């Protein structure tokens, strides 16, 4: 699978990420021009977590983000559908669980906060995944989605599209272990809803107080929400 227009098969998605796992962190830093570190910091700050909180880091990949979340003093678990990604991060000392975002292996109301970064695009049924995140979050608990989005400035959006569709694939061929995965990345970003569209999906999944904030000119957006009380 390389085109975002194809139906997402969960096992094909997992296999694609297994194939890029070995050089995933380096590739992300290179292709994002170092912005990935900034995006992780902002995601952690938006969650507002601390000691005593239980946090699910979904689509955690190699658990780089989970380690940074755990620095807050919260208990954090990394979950990902790609066993290869989790294995590539085995040196990182946080709990790791392999699981499908639409069928999470956790009990109801297990977490105070849930976050997913750059993974919701790859979930076969986005709303079902968001509903499952709500199921495992306690009432009043928090959600933060960090995902690629739509630049707000038209001129910048044009430059970004050129980078996404032309420069990024060339750079991926130089540094990535599976360049086709980054062709899929570019196409999946183009097919993804804008900030308001994603907010509507989050609300449709039962979350409340949905709001968003743009990062890097709207290349990325942080959507935050709260699970309503019973």
UniProtKB/Swiss-Prot annotation:
<dbReference type="GO" id="GO:0043770">
    <property type="term" value="F:demethylmenaquinone methyltransferase activity"/>
</dbReference>
<comment type="pathway">
    <text>Quinol/quinone metabolism; menaquinone biosynthesis; menaquinol from 1,4-dihydroxy-2-naphthoate: step 2/2.</text>
</comment>
<dbReference type="GO" id="GO:0032259">
    <property type="term" value="P:methylation"/>
</dbReference>
<keyword id="KW-0808">Transferase</keyword>
<dbReference type="Pfam" id="PF01209">
    <property type="entry name" value="Ubie_methyltran"/>
</dbReference>
<dbReference type="InterPro" id="IPR029063">
    <property type="entry name" value="SAM-dependent_MTases_sf"/>
</dbReference>
<protein>
    <recommendedName>
        <fullName>Demethylmenaquinone methyltransferase</fullName>
        <ecNumber>2.1.1.163</ecNumber>
    </recommendedName>
</protein>
<feature type="binding site">
    <location>
        <position position="80"/>
    </location>
    <ligand>
        <name>S-adenosyl-L-methionine</name>
    </ligand>
</feature>
<feature type="binding site">
    <location>
        <begin position="100"/>
        <end position="101"/>
    </location>
    <ligand>
        <name>S-adenosyl-L-methionine</name>
    </ligand>
</feature>
<keyword id="KW-0949">S-adenosyl-L-methionine</keyword>
<keyword id="KW-0474">Menaquinone biosynthesis</keyword>
<comment type="function">
    <text>Methyltransferase required for the conversion of demethylmenaquinol (DMKH2) to menaquinol (MKH2).</text>
</comment>
<feature type="binding site">
    <location>
        <position position="117"/>
    </location>
    <ligand>
        <name>S-adenosyl-L-methionine</name>
    </ligand>
</feature>
<keyword id="KW-0489">Methyltransferase</keyword>
<comment type="similarity">
    <text>Belongs to the class I-like SAM-binding methyltransferase superfamily. MenG/UbiE family.</text>
</comment>
<dbReference type="InterPro" id="IPR004033">
    <property type="entry name" value="UbiE/COQ5_MeTrFase"/>
</dbReference>
<dbReference type="GO" id="GO:0009234">
    <property type="term" value="P:menaquinone biosynthetic process"/>
</dbReference>
<dbReference type="InterPro" id="IPR023576">
    <property type="entry name" value="UbiE/COQ5_MeTrFase_CS"/>
</dbReference>
<feature type="binding site">
    <location>
        <position position="62"/>
    </location>
    <ligand>
        <name>S-adenosyl-L-methionine</name>
    </ligand>
</feature>
